[in-house]
Regions:
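Short, low-to-moderate order helix/coil transition modules at the start of elongated helical scaffolds
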Residues: 1-203, 210-213
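Conserved beta-strand/loop scaffold segments within soluble protein domains that form the structured core
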Residues: 117-381, 395-424
Length: 424
């Protein structure tokens, strides 16, 4: 793929950041860097990047600021009010002094640079290779066989923007393994320490073994000048289930991938997302799902609410492999445009190579229903309040699936900030 005219400068800077790691570089990270350099960076001419602007990002002066820390009071001021086992990462680096001791949790945790046994990427792309090459450590979380966690695991990622034109660059690499019969809830929380620009790269792989059950929630709550590029992989075994919800609620350019492989019969997947770009923000959500074996079930629901001059992008693919009989897969993308200049680009896709399957996809793009608005106004509800009621109801199908009341309230508060009349 051809690179942008200015991409060589960005690639050179990222190569320099990689070289600066010195002896910490691994063979696996080197391979990812080589893949990145071979691919180059995409242009608008490339179909997958047609609607995702990279020019401003690639003109940045990338640095990896080291040595930053926060006080416990600063951490708590940013933290979710959630009773959870918490691991804290600042600018991509693990800080044990700000994290909980997980000895009593039943979760085995290791933070090192050993990458030999990490799963291969399901659907690699350029920024996946970037994060794999620049993340300095790997955080491994293992939930043993038949263990059921009593509290969620919370991965708290705090990134600082820097004064001047330097773009602080933070990359996180995590791997979660649920062994057979295990159950866990994992929350990824991404936030900004201040209002300065920064660049976050995230990579989380999750293996859900036979008869294991995972609930995963991602909260992308970074500031309006941030860049966020992340790629999560899910691999499910026989009789396993996973329910993943991503709330993409902040960032100048935010692009999130979820790639999934259903590799064991009778596995079940629910994959949801909510994106709410405002002002000039761009939010790009992508899913890739491989029904590799038969007798599996998947349900996807992806919604966007686009305000002002914002742009939302959705691209989803369900692939049904040969012999994956009795596959049942559905994917829905619903979009609401609140501004005359708001835009959405949606592309749900099916690739079916097996017989006797039940698969469907669909997308809708519209505006607030005037009849609903008239009904609420006729009952004395003001225009803005009536709009907000309709929009909260539109998002409710996603927010009501959050089991934790405290977490749901935080998501609803963030949604409220991004609605017309909110504080964003």
């Amino acid at each position: 793929m051809a690179g942008l005219p200015n991409s060589s400068n960005a690639l050179q800077q990222w190569h320099h950041l990689f070289e600066a790691q010195g002896g910490q570089r691994t063979a696996e990270a080197t391979q990812h860097l080589q893949q990145l350099l071979r691919l180059g960076l995409p242009t608008r001419k490339h179909e997958d990047w047609k609607y995702t602007p990279l020019d401003a990002l690639l003109n940045g002066h990338f640095v990896a600021d080291e040595g930053a820390s926060l006080s416990a009071e600063q951490r708590d001021a940013l933290a979710l009010p959630l009773d959870a086992w918490r691991l804290v990462f600042i600018d991509g680096r693990y800080h044990p002094e700000l994290s909980d001791d997980l000895a009593a949790s039943g979760v085995e945790v290791s933070v090192d640079n050993q990458r030999q046994h990490l799963p291969d990427a399901l659907h690699p792309e350029v920024f996946l290779h970037l994060t794999e090459s620049l993340a300095q450590t790997v955080t491994r979380l293992r939930v043993p066989r038949n263990r059921r966690l009593d509290k969620p695991l919370l991965l708290m990622h705090i990134t600082r923007g820097l004064a001047g034109d330097a773009l602080n660059t933070a990359h996180c690499r995590h791997h979660l393994a649920l062994e057979s019969g295990a159950e866990a809830t994992v929350v990824e929380h991404y936030l900004s320490f201040n209002e300065q620009p920064h660049f976050t790269g995230g990579r989380l792989t999750m293996t859900v073994a036979d008869n294991a059950h995972l609930q995963h929630i991602k909260l992308a709550f970074e500031n309006a000048l941030s860049y966020h590029f992340a790629h999560n992989d899910l691999l499910l075994g026989r009789d396993a289930s996973a329910f993943s919800s991503s709330f993409l609620l902040g960032g100048q350019v935010l692009r999130h991938h979820t790639s999934t492989r259903l590799g064991g019969e009778n596995s079940n997947l629910r994959l949801n997302s909510l994106a709410m770009p405002v002002k000039n923000e761009v939010c790009d959500s992508r899913t890739w799902l491989d029904h590799q074996v038969g007798y599996c079930n998947s349900r996807q629901l992806h919604k966007t609410i686009v305000s002002d001059k914002g742009r939302a992008v959705f691209n989803g693919l369900i692939n049904v492999a040969p012999h994956a009989l009795k596959t049942d897969g559905q994917m829905t993308n619903n979009n609401l445009l609140l501004g005359r200049l708001a835009e959405v680009d949606t592309k749900p896709q099916l690739e079916i190579y097996a017989d006797d399957v039940k698969c469907s996809h669909g997308a809708t793009v519209g505006r607030i229903d005037e009849e609903q608005l008239f009904y609420l106004r006729s009952r004395g509800i003001e225009q803005q309040a009536a709009q907000q009621m309709i929009l909260y109801a539109f998002a409710a199908e996603l927010t009501e699936a959050i089991r934790s009341d405290a977490l749901r309230e935080q998501v609803l508060a963030r949604i409220g900030q991004r609605l017309p009349g909110g504080t964003v």
